[in-house]
Design a protein with these regions (language model features):
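Sec-dependent N-terminal signal peptides
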Residues: 4-13
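C-terminal motif of bacterial Sec signal peptides marking the signal peptidase cleavage site
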Residues: 15-17
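Interdomain boundary/hinge segments at the C-termini of tandem beta-sandwich modules
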Residues: 134-137
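Short, solvent-exposed loop/linker segments at beta-strand-coil boundaries, enriched for Pro/Gly
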Residues: 57-58, 63-83
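Aromatic sugar-binding surface patches on proteins
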Residues: 90-99
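Glycine-centered tight-turn and secondary-structure capping sites
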Residues: 101-116
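N-terminal edge beta-strand
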Residues: 21-49, 54
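Short, exposed beta-strand-loop hairpins at the edges of beta-sheets
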Residues: 114-128
């Protein structure tokens, strides 16, 4: 009986996640690739970046203007961050996080969301981002 209840809860959880993904566009970013990812979003639209971290990256950092600290993850962005969710990133294992944003750009220029890993961030005063995501708001 317990197996059936657990299975039912698992199915409900997956349905909930599918519904959420249907409402928000999700863009995948694989960290430590050293390349710029570019995405187009509409003004006012909510979108998500699904960040995949390679083993050895125990947290990731977004380098931009606003600062909001939570657990091991440091978030800095020009965008309104709605919320984030995902697997807690542990040293030496694969992890992922979803960051949900709302495109609130007032200018025509693309916005950059810059990432680096915690090790790079802590070793340097002005860390260079290892990843850049370019967001074009139409």
């Amino acid at each position: 009986m317990t197996k059936y209840i657990l299975f039912f809860l698992f199915v409900l959880l997956n349905l909930y996640n599918c519904e959420k993904e249907d409402k928000v566009k999700i863009y995948d970013v694989i960290l430590n690739q050293g390349k710029t990812n570019e995405f187009n979003v509409k003004k006012g639209e909510e979108f998500a970046l699904r960040l995949f971290c390679s083993p050895g990256t125990n947290s990731l950092i977004l380098l931009n203007k606003k600062e909001n600290q939570d657990s091991l993850t440091y978030i800095k962005s020009d965008y309104e961050i709605v919320h984030y969710e995902g697997e807690e990133l542990g040293l030496g294992r694969m992890g992922y996080l979803y960051y949900y944003f709302k495109a609130t750009s007032e200018t025509e220029e693309p916005k950059l969301i810059k990432f680096t890993d915690a090790y790079t961030y802590l070793q340097k005063e002005n860390p260079t981002p290892t990843e850049i995501v370019k967001i074009n708001v139409n």
